[in-house]
């Protein structure tokens, strides 16, 4: 980057003053905020769950409150917990001034229940779907998927975590006390003005990248926990930024789950990637340490911060995701890390079809075509397996609704251990091969979508439509 003479003089003057008058961005790095834990909503006894989409007030910087969008009166929504074999009635109420559609990424549902064009909720209206929960335990997320407006709607705050539990997860010796040793950790990046108001000006040829890392809506959060294992349910709800997470002292994460459920066994990983839309569950051993810090790469240096005064920066002011502080003595009864979690015995029948998917780089579209709500791009059959080969010259995440898949290879090489397990979102940097199971039916007027998970690219047309013919037709 080059500076004009005037900018150079300004930067030089500011640099001389750093020691005497620290910049706000510099001072804020060391301020810690208790991690906000979203309220927990559970389906019990057939009672409906109410989700009101409305304006709210929130502080992103700990100083100024600003108007945001939210769910049930706060930025981001409550965490919803449901159980396998529940039939969950939702009541979405739109109290905003524009149409919104909502979906739950990770829930295995028919196309009639996945939001989108046909399920837009007009201002002042409700949508009351009944969702049959028939899948194994998983960490999912619900969010706006409004046609051509998904990126700004998610950025403004229409998102939350959705947990599915089953008998297996209930009986495993894993941390499961919500907000005590089992935490939702929702990562986003924003750009805030001097009054803590989010700015949203995405580049015309890519997705929005901010310079301020937020976790559950705040900067530099911490939690206090008892000694023992803790569980973090990680969700990347950013529009376009991918994170590389690690623990500051070099210890490993013990990864136990990915997008669509638990892994057969815990996997120790030193560094964890998290693309937009991806979820991962990890355990961290806090039995012997007083403090552990989870980070997302390098923080901005002084010069990067100074540059950010003159032009938008994409370097994170602070890379701290979460500081974990252990208190008290180790309990006399502690659970060891289980060596086995679940049996993955899904039978794979023969693959009936191979498909090639090409994601355009800086121009929107899939296989050279922009999204058209009146066009079906792929027709498949429920209960069958397909091999999808997804290509991207510019790295980006890719998501498919209504299916579950496993990553078979990435650029001809076996997947990394952190990419084991059933998924619905994958990072594509070159060429990936996916084994896709067509789990749910969809229809011409209620198709599944597959799209670039860079939300601005999806809004511009990097979306295709999938009809999965029901098994009895």
UniProtKB/Swiss-Prot annotation:
Keyword Methyltransferase tagged: no
Compartment list: Periplasm
Signal peptide: 1-27
Alphabetical list of Gene3D superfamilies matching this protein: Cupredoxins - blue copper proteins
Keywords: Cell cycle, Cell division, Periplasm, Signal
CC annotations in GO: cell division site; outer membrane-bounded periplasmic space
Database matches in CDD domains: CuRO_2_CueO_FtsP, CuRO_3_CueO_FtsP
Post-translational modification: Predicted to be exported by the Tat system. The position of the signal peptide cleavage has not been experimentally proven.
Major subcellular location class: periplasm
Disulfide bonds: none
GO molecular function, one term: oxidoreductase activity
Any Pfam family the entry gives: Cu-oxidase_3
GO biological process, one term: FtsZ-dependent cytokinesis
Family of this protein: Belongs to the FtsP family.
HAMAP family per UniProt: FtsP (MF_00915)
Function field: Cell division protein that is required for growth during stress conditions. May be involved in protecting or stabilizing the divisomal assembly under conditions of stress.
Stated name of the protein: Cell division protein FtsP
Lineage, top ranks: Bacteria, Pseudomonadati, Pseudomonadota, Gammaproteobacteria, Enterobacterales
Encoding gene per record: ftsP
């Amino acid at each position: 980057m080059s500076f004009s003479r005037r900018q150079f003089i300004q930067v030089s003057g500011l640099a001389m003053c750093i020691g005497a008058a620290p910049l706000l961005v510099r001072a804020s790095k060391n301020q810690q905020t208790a991690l906000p834990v979203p309220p927990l909503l559970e389906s019990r006894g057939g009672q409906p769950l109410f989700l009101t989409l409305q304006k709210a007030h929130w502080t992103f910087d700990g100083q100024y409150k600003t108007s945001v969008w939210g769910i049930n009166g706060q930025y981001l929504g409550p965490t919803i917990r449901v159980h396998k074999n529940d039939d969950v009635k939702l009541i979405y109420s739109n109290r905003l001034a524009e149409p919104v559609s909502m979906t739950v990424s990770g829930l295995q549902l028919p196309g009639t229940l996945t939001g989108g064009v046909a399920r837009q909720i007009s201002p002042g209206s409700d949508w009351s779907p009944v969702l049959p929960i028939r899948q194994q335990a998983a960490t999912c997320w619900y969010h706006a998927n409004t046609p051509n407006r998904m990126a700004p709607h998610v950025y403004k705050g229409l998102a939350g975590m959705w947990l599915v539990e089953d008998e297996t997860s209930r009986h495993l010796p894993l941390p499961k006390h919500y907000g005590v040793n089992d935490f939702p950790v929702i990562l986003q990046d924003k750009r805030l003005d001097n009054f803590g108001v989010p700015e949203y000006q995405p580049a015309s040829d890519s997705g929005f990248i901010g310079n301020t890392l937020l976790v559950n809506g705040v900067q530099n959060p911490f939690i206090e926990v008892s000694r023992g294992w803790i569980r973090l349910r990680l969700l990347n709800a950013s529009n376009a930024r991918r994170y590389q997470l690690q623990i500051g002292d070099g210890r490993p994460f013990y990864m136990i789950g990915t997008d669509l459920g638990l892994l057969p066994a815990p996997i120790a990983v030193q560094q964890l990637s998290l693309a937009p839309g991806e979820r991962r569950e990890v355990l961290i051993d806090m039995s012997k340490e007083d403090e552990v810090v989870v980070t997302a790469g390098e923080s901005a240096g002084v010069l990067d911060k100074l540059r950010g005064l003159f032009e938008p920066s994409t370097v994170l002011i602070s890379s701290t995701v979460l500081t974990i502080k252990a208190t008290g003595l180790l309990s006399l009864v502690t659970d060891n890390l289980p060596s086995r979690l679940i049996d993955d015995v899904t039978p794979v029948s023969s693959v009936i079809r191979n498909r090639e998917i090409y994601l355009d780089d800086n121009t929107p579209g899939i296989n050279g075509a922009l999204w058209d709500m009146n066009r079906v791009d792929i027709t498949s059959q429920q209960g069958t397996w397909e091999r999808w080969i997804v290509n991207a010259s510019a790295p980006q995440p890719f998501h498919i609704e209504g299916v579950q898949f496993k990553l078979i290879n990435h650029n001809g090489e076996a997947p990394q251990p952190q990419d084991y397990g059933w998924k619905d979102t994958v990072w594509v940097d070159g060429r990936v091969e996916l084994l896709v199971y067509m789990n749910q039916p969809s229809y011409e007027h209620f198709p599944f979508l597959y799209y670039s998970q860079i939300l601005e690219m999806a809004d511009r047309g990097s979306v295709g439509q999938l009809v999965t013919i029901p098994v009895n037709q």
